[in-house]
Swiss-Prot record:
PROSITE patterns: BZIP
Protein name: bZIP transcription factor 39
A GO CC term assigned to this protein in UniProt: nucleus
Gene assigned in the entry: BZIP39
Origin species: Oryza sativa subsp. japonica
Intervals, Cytoplasmic compartment: 1-311
Stretches in topological domain Lumenal: 333-646
Subcellular location, principal: endoplasmic reticulum
Protein induction: Induced by dithiothreitol- and tunicamycin-induced endoplasmic reticulum (ER) stress response.
Length: 646
């Protein structure tokens, strides 16, 4: 440890021992104690030649070489020291060289060397390293004892030139060593940083591998969880029922379907411990638990059976509806719409508007008998005759042809309407009978053909003679009325009387030969003598009234050209008809029923279904196999209640 040096503030200041840049140029420098101008040092001869890399730290660590002699020790202790010795002592003690890392502390002491009480300054050196270099030792004092300021100052003045050169070389070497140390430390720091970065990269790689491993484990566990859930939901027998085994295994325990290394940390050698399978403690709950999958199966089977039953029921219902539709359209049942009890319906046909419609024969009347009452009706299984006539009695017509009820379905009011063709035939037959009576009255066939506007008689039972009719065998007048138009068993009902003749034409006489169209055998013996005896007289008022065509009349509409008592035309007709031979019976056959194309549509769709209701139909009738007559029949409008003809 360097000894502290005392600095006399009253001593003269020597600028040669201190760098000039530390002091202001305008600072006045006083002499020893007198302060005279003579004591001032000349500064003109001094030259301050400093290097470019000069530093204060290097300057503080550098000091001139001092002598270790003990001269002037006593003189330096006194207060009367020479002015030249004070700055020398301060300069020698101001800086102590101790390597490159030392620190310098300035301490102010209140103690005085003499009893004068003047302040004393000292520089204390604190060394960082105990081993000084050999070159630095040359710049320090060689002695260990106290050196007086005057002696050190004199010694420094002698060897100042040699010490300056040695210190410069020493400073250069020290600077080079410091640079080398700095470079080595920088290199070591870079290497440490590089190693640290490499370690961090290795850690990042290891973390990435751990993350990938954990992701693979998570995916494996998720897949196994999904498989177990599927087995539990499907009621698999392989999975144990809940409640029998422990609720959950220990986290360290491995599953049997997973590999051993998948759940163990790397480097461990723990053997795999199998899952213990315990026997059920409670047999009763276990039996109940075992039955759960069976109950699930039964529930699933029941649900499947229910769905199958519903499907079968729906399919069977559709099939039944289809069968009903087929049978209802092509295989009709017995006709009970007209209240016919004794009638034998051996064959029934429906006309759907085809061009090749069936021809139905209608029994004609035998005109040879004059005393039999004529009855136009639907029931042809029985005949009503005059019991007063010789050889006449009520008997069924075994040789007569059976009337086949032609059931016609016409679209009207959004649905199909059933029309009985036999009643149309009887209506046309009544019209033809009136025309025949008119023709026999005029004795001219040409006049009968030219008479186009004839009324249509209502097809119903005519009045029978009260004295000649056996009322027990005839049908009651209050019985069901013949109807040829009905909409679904309800709605408006139309009887005959709404038909009018449109035109007629004859065919060749060859068609009337036995090889042609065969007329039906007579069914009812025609007689008009007593047919109209009980027609009310007030029916003639029909000519004076104009009624709505929708209104049905409760009496027969009288034909055109009748007399006041309404019996002359029938009497004349019966007389003339009695002269006709029996070999040519009269017959009428419905050939076809047509609809107005303007109302039925364009015919692109189904001919049986039309969205428009029909108001008129055309009926083509073959009369006696030689003449075709076309009638226009008006259909009634739909109403809430049926209209009946009384």
């Amino acid at each position: 440890m360097a000894e502290p040096a005392l600095l006399d503030p009253t001593a003269a200041f020597d600028l040669r021992l201190y760098p000039a840049h530390l002091f202001d140029h305008e600072l006045p420098l006083a002499g020893g104690g007198g302060g005279d101008d003579d004591d001032d040092l000349p500064l003109d001869g001094l030259e301050f030649d400093l290097p470019g890399d000069f530093s204060v730290e290097d300057f503080l660590l550098r000091s001139p070489e001092r002598d270790d002699s003990g001269e002037g020790s006593a003189a330096g202790s006194g207060p009367t020291a020479s002015p030249s010795s004070s700055p020398t002592t301060s300069a020698s003690n101001s800086a102590v060289a101790n390597g490159s890392g030392g620190e310098v502390k300035h301490e102010e002491s209140d103690e005085g060397r003499s009893g004068g009480g003047d302040p004393k300054w000292s520089l204390k050196r604190k060394q960082a390293s105990p081993g000084p270099s050999s070159d630095a030792a040359k710049c320090r004092r060689s002695g260990d004892g106290d050196v007086s300021p005057s002696a050190s100052a004199s010694r420094t003045a002698v060897d100042s030139d040699e010490g300056g050169t040695v210190c410069e070389e020493e400073e250069d070497e020290r600077r080079a060593a410091r640079l080398m140390r700095n470079r080595e430390s920088a290199q070591l720091s870079r290497q440490r940083k590089k190693r640290y970065v490499e370690e961090l990269e290795e850690k990042v790689k290891s973390m990435h591998s751990v993350i990938n491993d954990l992701n693979s484990r998570i995916s494996f566990v998720v897949a196994e969880n999904a498989t177990l859930r599927q087995q539990l939901s499907g009621g698999s027998v392989n999975c144990p029922p809940p409640g029998v085994y422990p609720p959950a295994p220990i986290p360290g325990m491995h599953f049997p379907w997973m590999p051993g290394y998948a759940m163990r940390p790397p480097g461990s050698h723990v053997p795999l411990v199998p899952i213990p399978r315990l026997k059920p403690q409670q047999p009763v709950p276990s039996s109940k638990v075992v039955k759960k999958p069976e109950s699930k199966k039964t529930v699933e089977n029941k649900s499947k059976s229910k769905t199958k039953t519903k499907k079968v029921a729906s399919v069977s219902l559709l099939g039944l509806l289809l069968i009903m539709l087929v049978f209802g359209a092509f295989i009709p049942g017995f006709n009970h719409n007209f209240g016919m009890c004794g009638q034998s319906d051996n064959a029934m046909f429906r006309n759907f508007g085809q061009s090749h419609a069936r021809v139905l024969s209608v029994s004609s009347q035998d005109k040879s008998s004059l005393n039999n009452s004529d009855m136009i009706g639907v029931d042809v299984g029985k005949m009503t005759g005059n019991t007063d006539g010789p050889g006449k009695k009520h008997q069924p017509a075994h040789n007569s042809s059976e009337i086949l009820p032609a059931l016609l379905y016409v679209p009207r009011n959004g649905k199909h309407v059933k029309i009985n063709g036999n009643l149309i035939i009887h209506s046309v037959l009544a019209s033809e009978k009136a025309v025949a009576h008119k023709a026999s009255k005029d004795d001219s066939d040409q006049s009968a053909r030219d008479h186009k506007e004839t009324s249509v008689a209502i097809a119903r039972y005519l009045s029978l003679p009260g004295k000649d009719v056996n009322r027990q065998e005839t049908s009651s007048a209050d019985g069901p009325l013949p109807q040829w138009f009905r909409e679904g068993m309800e709605g408006p009902i139309l009887n005959s009387g709404m038909c009018s003749e449109v035109f007629q034409f004859d065919i060749s006489t060859a068609s009337s030969n036995p090889g042609g169209i065969i007329p039906a055998s007579p069914v009812v013996n025609s007689s008009s003598v007593n047919a109209t005896e009980k027609i009310p007289a007030h029916s003639a008022a029909y000519h004076g009234k104009l009624k709505n065509r929708r209104v049905m009349y409760n009496e027969a509409i009288p034909l055109t050209g009748k007399t006041a008592n309404n019996t002359e035309p029938f009497n004349r007709t019966s007389e003339s008809s009695s002269k006709l031979p029996d070999s040519k019976p009269a017959s009428s056959v419905v050939v076809s029923v047509l609809a107005d194309p303007r109302e039925a549509g364009n015919g692109d769709g189904d001919p049986r279904v039309s969205p428009k209701p029909l108001s008129k139909i055309f009926v083509v009738v073959l009369v006696d196999g030689v003449r075709y007559v076309t009638y226009s029949c008006t259909l009634p409008f739909k109403s809430s209640s049926p209209h009946l003809v009384n």
